[in-house]
A protein has these predicted regions:
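Extracytoplasmic/periplasmic copper-protein system
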Residues: 35-80, 199-231, 236-238, 245-249, ...
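Histidine- and aromatic-enriched segments that form or immediately flank copper-ligand environments
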Residues: 86-207, 293-326, 344-362
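Acidic-aromatic/histidine active-site loop/patch
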Residues: 223-279
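C-terminal motif of bacterial Sec signal peptides marking the signal peptidase cleavage site
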Residues: 28-30
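Detector for the c-type heme attachment site
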Residues: 134, 190-193, 211-213, 229, ...
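Gly/Gly-Pro-rich "capping" loops immediately C-terminal to redox-active cysteine motifs
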Residues: 392, 404-436, 452, 456-457
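C-terminal capping alpha-helices of c-type cytochrome domains
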Residues: 120, 425-429, 451-484
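Sequence/structural segment immediately N-terminal to covalent heme-attachment motifs in c-type
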Residues: 385-406, 487
Length: 487
């Protein structure tokens, strides 16, 4: 039997370092395995918001304020302070939701959607709101009678009977809360009838970051809010400036038949002013479907979502998603890498919604204009006549793949000048049933000989046909004199 050899000091040190390294790895692994449970440990949550306060003191300053607020699609960095003071006053005002369409809206912060609130888990949010619905809208329009309004934060865990009570015009409500869960949460007015208040524009987003931030680093961060508008021409025939006024159509609202489905409050809202990114960047989109009644299938053409965090919580992770399905008030954070230079179109892949305006563009340095008409990228025409506006929107959503107005023939003729070549009655019959016209009308037969693809029947209503013709007349009257383009 031999005696054991005493290890050298160097060997003893190496062994100690190895044991320390293994011990640290085990501890780190244990911490990581415990961290999800720790994040949702009830004892760490704050359930002491304190009572709400309602006063008769009217605020007359800015309609929205606070370092935690973002006022457009770009999300501002998180403010350092753990105390976030925000103000979101309610107003009745006029917004533009489409070319030639001014809408009598109810708002938070005098915009639709309302400003985005950006906080983190554990922050103390100090909220105040004055009901300013009795203040005249721009141009001294009294759009609707002043009324009660309230605030419902989905990010808060509070007694709604206290915090979400309705206040009268001129009153001010204030309360505090602490967000206990990360996510992308809706806020909205909760005053009956809630449906009408949300459909009139009273909604927005609260982004609650995890205590320790997100597991990835994004190069670009944008907030996308999908919502519906249900409109009809103002029965009093008022206008906002030179733009006809539209008001809420309660019948369409109850039938779930929206006139527009939009991103960030505007028809094709981020097309003329696209979001910006660069090839190779990680883009993070905070997406909320505010409804009030429809579903969204959010998709970015040319991208695959590397990570999807349902409801905006990184613990609810999916990978490699093509489309995210969101019900009313549902949300997700989606991330993707921009693969190369180009224009990336955001759409609701329920294309009936996309045709109503749920379209946007992420411009990643496209070198030339792309032909993406089938995603409803709009032309530049902006009529103000209500029927011409509807005709324009229908033309852009259904016709741009085959026709232009002034940019030359495609699969079908350039339609600029069509009202100078054809009578309204001929156009009415053509739009009602092009397939029947081709077999019976000489002019239609000539078109069929010139263009090999016959236009299929579109099943248009009489009202839709009238709107198309009004739009064609507007385009022909607005264009510079030139030779008719259509044979």
């Amino acid at each position: 039997m031999t005696d054991a050899v005493d290890p050298s000091p160097l060997a003893r040190r190496a062994k100690a370092l190895l044991l320390a390294s293994l011990s640290g790895a085990l501890v780190l692994s244990a911490c990581q395995s415990r961290s999800p449970a720790e994040r949702y440990e009830i004892s760490r949550m704050n359930f002491n918001p304190g009572p709400a306060h309602v006063t008769q003191e009217r605020h007359t300053g800015p309609f929205a304020s606070g370092s935690a607020l973002s006022f457009d699609a770009a999300l501002k960095p998180l403010a350092r302070s753990r105390n976030k003071t925000i103000r979101l006053d309610t107003t009745h005002t006029v917004i533009r939701i489409a070319p030639g369409v001014a809408f009598a809206a109810w708002t938070f912060g005098n915009q639709v959607p309302g400003p985005t609130v950006h906080v983190r888990v554990g922050d103390r949010v100090h909220f105040s709101m004055t009901n300013r619905s009795d203040e005249p809208a721009p141009g001294a329009l009294q759009l609707s009678a002043p009324m009660m309004h309230s605030m419902d934060f989905h990010a808060a865990m509070v007694a709604p009977t206290d915090k979400y009570q309705s206040i009268a015009p001129g009153q001010t409500m204030s309360f505090e809360f602490t967000p206990n869960y990360p996510g992308v949460f809706m806020y909205h007015c909760g005053t009956p009838m809630v449906l009408e208040h949300i459909a009139s524009g009273m909604y927005g987003v609260v982004v609650v970051e995890p205590r320790d931030g997100y597991p990835t680093k994004a190069d670009r961060e944008y907030v996308i809010v999908q919502s519906e508008f249900y409109t009809k021409p103002d029965p009093q025939h008022r206008s906002a400036g030179a733009v006809p006024l539209y008001v809420l159509d309660g019948d369409r609202l109850r039938r779930k038949a929206p006139t527009y489905t939009v991103f960030n409050g505007r028809y094709n809202g981020m097309v003329a002013q696209p979001l910006i990114a660069k090839p190779g960047e990680r883009v993070r989109l905070y997406v909320l479907n505010a409804g009030p009644s429809d579903t969204s299938s959010f998709h970015v053409v040319g991208a695959i979502f590397d990570r999807v965090w349902l409801d905006g919580n990184p613990d609810n992770q999916l990978r490699g998603m093509q489309t995210v399905l969101l019900g009313s008030s549902s949300s997700a954070i989606v991330e993707f890498i921009v693969p190369e230079a180009g224009s990336y179109v955001m759409v609701d892949h329920q294309f009936a919604n996309a045709s109503q305006g749920a379209v946007g563009v992420i411009d990643a340095g496209a070198h030339e204009e792309s032909a993406i008409e089938h995603h409803n990228i709009p032309a530049s025409a902006t009529p103000t006549d209500p029927e011409a506006v509807q005709g324009k929107l229908s033309f852009e959503s259904k016709c741009l793949a085959c026709h232009t107005l002034g940019n030359g023939a495609k699969l079908g003729p350039d339609l600029l000048g069509v009202t100078k070549l054809r009578s309204d009655e001929w156009l009415r019959r053509w739009l009602a049933s092009p397939e029947a016209m081709v077999s019976a009308d000489a002019d239609a037969k000539a078109l069929r000989a010139h263009y090999p693809i016959t236009m299929p029947d579109q099943n248009l209503s009489d009202a839709e046909i009238r709107q198309y013709i009004r739009y064609f007349h507007w385009a022909d009257e607005a264009s510079k004199p030139q030779a008719p383009a259509m044979p």
